[in-house]
Amino acid sequence: MRFSIVLSSIAALSSVAAAERVCGAIPHRTFAKESKAAIEAATAAGLTTKANITVETYFHVITAGSKGEINNYGPAGIGFKLMDVSRTDNAKWASGGDETGMKKSLRKGGYSALNVYFAPNLEGGLLGFCYFPKANPSANDKLVDGCVILSGSVPGGEAAPYNEGKTTTHEVGHYMGLYHVFNEEQGNCQKDGDMVADTPVQGTKTSGCPQGKDSCPGQGVDSIHNYMDYSDEYVLLSPVYDSWHQTNHRHFSPCMNQFTPGQISRMQMMWQQFRAGK
């Protein structure tokens, strides 16, 4: 099934514009300890080399009475196989309400299956959220697992400048075990907030696409192009005049466009330790 066709139809569901990126993913209190132990176990087992992963994926499109390809993971050796797409008309779910009831009704697959729920309105101005993996998930953890994404953030949606699908990439990063690249304690340059060695220490989240941003001098410039920052997804370049058609063309340049090798290695190990075969 073509992700691009599905995502284009999802884009038509939302007219919500986003003023700033707001991510609702919150690591559970034991995740730092569990992920550290998982990295150590994977390293001891020799699972640090890159191996191809295919994640069974289910899309659930929620509407309220009106009427994808997740391709940024290819270089990481992680692919997403779209198994099914469901479409549901439910006003409460479309506004982010009754999450448990929605997932109890719609969720498919095991803990290794990614369920993505697209809704036209989310509470608190969120663009989306995913649940971090757990070492020993309860039945409820398995039920609520997955991602809830604002429909307007998919390619062609209305949540500019966050409407190129990078919100889904960002949130799925959390599903795969990645933190934000910036320190959640804003302004703190004393510790590495994301537990990945090749992302420079970053004291603040990014807004826009400010080249050379350096919130922690001496630690390396901020990772403004990283999928796990809060940057805009693209930058509008100066118009280029087309003399043949006598009109100006607007050109865009991607801002959010990369994972580091360290992040890729972490996702691979988190998958093997927390989700594979479950």
Curated annotation (Swiss-Prot):
Origin superkingdom: Eukaryota
One of the record's GO cellular component terms: extracellular region
Primary localization class, coarse: secreted
GO process annotations (BP): proteolysis
Family under the similarity heading: Belongs to the peptidase M43B family.
PANTHER family tied to this protein: METALLOPROTEASE MEP1 (AFU_ORTHOLOGUE AFUA_1G07730)-RELATED, PTHR47466
Function: Secreted metalloproteinase that allows assimilation of proteinaceous substrates. Plays a pivotal role as a pathogenicity determinant during infections and contributes to the ability of the pathogen to persist within the mammalian host.
Name of the protein described by the UniProt record: Extracellular metalloprotease MCYG_03238
Organism: Arthroderma otae (strain ATCC MYA-4605 / CBS 113480)
